[in-house]
Each structure stands twice: as structure tokens, then as C-alpha cells.
Amino acid sequence: MSQLKNDRYLRALLREPVDYTPVWMMRQAGRYLPEYKATRAQAGDFMSLCRNAELACEVTLQPLRRYDLDAAILFSDILTVPDAMGLGLSFGAGEGPKFARPVENAAMVENLPIPDPETELQYVMNAVRTIRRELQGEVPLIGFSGSPWTLATYMVEGGSSKAFTKIKKMMYADPQTLHKLLDKVSDAVILYLNAQIKAGAQAVMIFDTWGGVLAHRDYPDFSLQYMQKIVAGLIRENDGRKVPITLFTKGGGLWLEQIANSGCDAVGVDWTVNLAEAKAKIGHKVALQGNMDPSVLYARPARIRQEVRSILADFGNGSGHVFNLGHGIHQDVPVENPKIFVDAVHEYSKAYHK
């Protein structure tokens, strides 16, 4: 593999010195880019795009051609794992994901297979290998998965949800079945992420998009303990380098100390979290990633720069901060605005790394 030319992202995750704060954006390969829309049209539909290694590589690299980003993230979807477990994933035009065979009871959990990442999910590993080759060591490649709780919400609800009544019914009325499901999904995710690391992912991130819908006493049992199980099962060194792990629970500000004790290297935070307070609580133990509200990217350039300055000031001096949005970039953001954002992070952060 090519020697890494820009390893600031990996160094910041390990709280090692950097000369400026590295930055990337969740969903940086996506619908706000006209070239992404063109490639997706060429693929035919979303899952065909994910399953074509060359096209998945192309959309992964597109934002790096426009913006001076410090990391690439694999173009894929968190639902590849439950899809490979036989739930029948589909994306209707303009609709969210749907599963033809949602998980409804203990017998269905029992019958779920744990997919082999190099057979049922080989298309993801092929994409990782292709992207690593094409990146030529410019920036690190991030692999990822959904968290067991977040994946289980889709598997039980049969798709996206606003109220999460089906999975919460299972959680309160039949917790044993839900724990069995979460345990099985954790095993599948460990295999999946380790396969991504072996294929060339240099860091991994676990997206716990729906952890924040849990009651404060349920989160450790139904979300965090399973992410902790994954962290304990992951390959932590590859190619002679540490493979850093970031956990991101949207709405997870209540549980920062517990997340930081999970064994991860970095904790992602959304825009509801005060970065200065988060650093004071857990910055001695883990790096922090975040946390600009993605809607700031609708603003005028001066307002974007002002927000970048404020967040950098919140974190203050030293390494251990990866600048990012607090969630994915919105699909109708003006395409020139991420450049203003990324360049501002690089320019204004240098003063904090002397």
C-alpha cells in the first residue's frame, strides 16, 4: 500500500501533535454534489451504486477533488449488514429504506444468519480495496458500520421510524429477544469491520444514529454495551499503525463519560454538545469529533467562518479534535460552501497547534 501523505486525521484521533485541525464531513460523498447525482444515475439505483466497486470508489473520491479534506470515507450504507442477513432491503424512489422481512420474534432472531464479509458483503470489501488503491496514500480511508442498536431499529421497525414503537415494545415487553438480536448483530459487525480493516480501512467509525432516542438508563444496556463489545473485538493495529475507532451517538451528550470508557479512541458529538465542556470531561481520555450544525452550511461565507472560529475556540489549544459536522451534510447545501468551511478550519486552527 502507498505511504500515507497526510495522516493528520489519524494523528488527531490518537491525540498526537498536528499542525492544523483535520476536517472531513459526514455524508461528504452525496446528493449535494452534482457529480454524485450523475454517477448514481449511471448506476441505476442506490444499492447498485454501493455494489459497484468502481462507482463506489468514484463517489468516495468526488468530494476530495473539490475540497481539501483530511480523510475519505467509504461510500456504502449502514444497512448492508442487515441486508446480508436476508431481510430484503429496498430503497423506493424518494423514500427511505424498507425491509421486506422485518424481525418480529425470537424465532426470527434465531434464524438470522451471520454474513461472511468476504462472500455476502464482498462488494463492500472490493470497494475498500479499490478506494485504497486509487487514493494512492493521499489521505486515510475510514470504514464504518451502524451500531447494533441503530441497525436493530431498522430491522425491527422494517425501515425508518419516528416513534420507534416496535423496537421499544420489544425492548420493554421482550428484552431477552432484543438482547439476542443485538448480540447477533454485534458479532456480524465485528466480522464486517475487521474485514474492512483487512481490506485497507485505516480507521473505523460506528454510527449510532438512534442511540439518542433511548431513555437515559436504557442507553448503556441496549446501545453502549454492544458498541463496547465491538470495540473489544476489533483489529486495533494493521500495516504497522494503530487503527483508531470513533463512536458517534447522535443525541449522546448525556453519556459522554460512559462512551469515553468504552475503549474507543474518539467520541463523535453533535451540535447540542458544548465542545469545551466535552473536552473538560473526556478530553484527557479520547479525541473528540464534531460538531458544527450542518445547517450552518446554508449561511453566507462570513457566518460559516464565524461558526468555525467559535467551535475551534471551544476546543482550544492542542490536538485531539477532528472537525466535522454534528451529523450528515444536507443534500441541498450550495456546493461552494463546504470549501469555505474546510478552508476556514485549516486556516484558523493553525494558531491552536503551535
Curated annotation (Swiss-Prot):
User: Which species is listed as the source?
Assistant: Actinobacillus succinogenes (strain ATCC 55618 / DSM 22257 / CCUG 43843 / 130Z)
> What are the GO BP annotations of this UniProt entry?
protoporphyrinogen IX biosynthetic process from glutamate
Recorded catalytic reaction(s): these are: uroporphyrinogen III + 4 H(+) = coproporphyrinogen III + 4 CO2
EC numbers on record: 4.1.1.37
Family the UniProt entry places it in? Belongs to the uroporphyrinogen decarboxylase family.
Q: Name one Pfam family in it.
A: URO-D
> What protein name is recorded for this chain?
Uroporphyrinogen decarboxylase
Q: Which CDD domains match?
A: URO-D
| Protein localization | Cytoplasm
Query: Single GO cellular component annotation?
Result: cytosol
- Recorded superkingdom: Bacteria
Kindly state the subunit structure of this protein.
Homodimer.
User: Span of the secretion signal?
Assistant: none
The metabolic or biological pathway listed in the UniProt record of this protein is:
Porphyrin-containing compound metabolism; protoporphyrin-IX biosynthesis; coproporphyrinogen-III from 5-aminolevulinate: step 4/4
The record's keywords, sorted A to Z, are: Cytoplasm, Decarboxylase, Lyase, Porphyrin biosynthesis
Q: What does this protein do?
A: Catalyzes the decarboxylation of four acetate groups of uroporphyrinogen-III to yield coproporphyrinogen-III.
**What is the gene name?**
hemE
Site residues, Transition state stabilizer: 77
The record's annotation in PROSITE patterns points to:
UROD_1, UROD_2
